């Protein structure tokens, strides 16, 4: 149903003369991301919940071997999405939210800027491995200090690995009034 609806929406907009790119923001369901990549010009995925739901706390400790197995599971699921994006010239936004880091990342790095960066870099490395570079990045946190620190760390890590991608930084839950404007 989602597939036919998205296809119909895309076709209807194009038939009406609209050429604004469609962007899908997908959480918790990699299958939906696959379908969205067929009809949207850009799909946002969240590393914290792309394969597994974020913060389930079902597993609190990961050995190095278990950590590597989880990364392999992510890669195995991400490759079909990458291929769909390549075939359809669909861009990807890797959108990392401080509030939705995976249990695996939180176990290894804590609830830190380093965890945000690790989460993003894992996905960037997979995209690079499969020669897909139509990627933009967003880093978001409700804490401006965490967000700024995360972005600076991410830029440093990307530079170390020879990566350059457009980067959006955002403050979630900015609020209203003067506090919201300052954030």
Roles of regions detected by a PLM:
Residues 16-17, 40-77, 104-115:
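Glycine-rich tight-turn/loop motif centered on a GG-T
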Residues 20-26, 43-45, 92-96, 135-139, ...:
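Hydrophobic faces of well-ordered beta-strands that scaffold small-molecule active sites
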Residues 32-37, 74-92, 156:
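Short amphipathic alpha-helices and their capping/turn segments at secondary-structure boundaries
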């Amino acid at each position: 149903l989602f597939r036919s609806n998205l296809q119909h929406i895309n076709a209807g907009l194009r038939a009406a003369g609209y050429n604004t790119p469609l962007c899908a923001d997908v959480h918790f369901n990699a299958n939906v991301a696959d379908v969205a990549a067929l009809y949207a010009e850009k799909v946002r995925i969240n590393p914290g919940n792309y394969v597994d739901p974020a913060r389930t706390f079902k597993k609190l400790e990961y050995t190095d071997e278990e950590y590597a197995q989880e990364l392999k599971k992510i890669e195995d699921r991400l490759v079909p999405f990458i291929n769909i994006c390549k075939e359809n010239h669909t861009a990807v936004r890797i959108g990392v939210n401080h509030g939705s880091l995976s249990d695996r990342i939180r176990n290894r790095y804590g609830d830190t800027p380093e965890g945000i960066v690790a989460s993003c870099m894992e996905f960037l490395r997979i995209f690079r491995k499969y020669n897909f570079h139509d990627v933009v990045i967003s880093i978001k946190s409700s804490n401006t200090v965490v967000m700024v620190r995360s972005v600076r760390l991410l830029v440093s890590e990307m530079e170390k690995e020879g990566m350059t991608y457009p980067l959006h930084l955002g403050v979630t839950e900015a609020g209203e009034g003067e506090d919201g404007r300052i954030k």
